[in-house]
Amino acid sequence: MISTSQIPDSFVSPCRRASVSRTTKETDVQVTIDLDGSGNCRAQTGIPFLDHMLQQIASHAAIDLDVRATGDIEIDDHHTNEDVGITLGQALLQALGDKKGIVRFGHFVAPLDEALVQVALDFSGRPHLSYGLEIPTQRVGTYDTQLVREFFVALVNHSQMTLHIRQLDGINSHHIIEATFKAFARAMSMAIAIDPRRAGIIPSSKGVL
């Protein structure tokens, strides 16, 4: 029987969890993330549609996510939506640490009825968003569909990832957005996975990300 002390450090998975808080005059946001979770989610942002999308991320990326937010939603959802994206991005970056051993790249195409969305991402350390959604309505329920892009802008900038989103088909706004979040989650699940062939190695020819 081999004890854990006999296992090389490079094969021991680090704790990939983070908790981040952000407080401004407009919002108060707390995010806890566990990249090696099982898809559990508790999302209470005051924005029901955003909560639903955060649940898609947790479920389809198989991460545990706890997001609490209060904000000036009596004005509109913009500040809370953006600050949740910022805080989630910061928590994701912190949980990834030095990124040793991760696959780094992820890609997925998700269908939802008539909608089809392609997502590719890279935890490169270089924030970039290429956003190609054409959402036909201004709102889904009470949620302003312009805020989808604002959420991903905030998330990308603060997680330092490169993210490409392409809508291949779709006419229903809810389906397009939900397919996007599902594709993003599945691509992220691939990218954050540990590659046993690269255990303890930063996945870059430069040696740093």
From Swiss-Prot:
InterPro entries: IGPD_sf, ImidazoleglycerolP_deHydtase, ImidazoleglycerP_deHydtase_CS, Ribosomal_Su5_D2-typ_SF. It catalyses: D-erythro-1-(imidazol-4-yl)glycerol 3-phosphate = 3-(imidazol-4-yl)-2-oxopropyl phosphate + H2O. PANTHER family: IMIDAZOLEGLYCEROL-PHOSPHATE DEHYDRATASE (PTHR23133:SF2), IMIDAZOLEGLYCEROL-PHOSPHATE DEHYDRATASE HIS7 (PTHR23133). Disulfide bonds: none annotated. It comes from Microcystis aeruginosa (strain NIES-843 / IAM M-2473). Its main location: cytoplasm. Belongs to the imidazoleglycerol-phosphate dehydratase family. Keywords: Amino-acid biosynthesis, Cytoplasm, Histidine biosynthesis, Lyase. One of its GO terms (biological process) is L-histidine biosynthetic process. Pathway: Amino-acid biosynthesis; L-histidine biosynthesis; L-histidine from 5-phospho-alpha-D-ribose 1-diphosphate: step 6/9. It is found in: Cytoplasm. Its EC number is 4.2.1.19. SUPFAM superfamilies: Ribosomal protein S5 domain 2-like. PROSITE patterns: IGP_DEHYDRATASE_1, IGP_DEHYDRATASE_2. One of its GO terms (cellular component) is cytoplasm. This is Imidazoleglycerol-phosphate dehydratase. One of its GO terms (molecular function) is imidazoleglycerol-phosphate dehydratase activity.
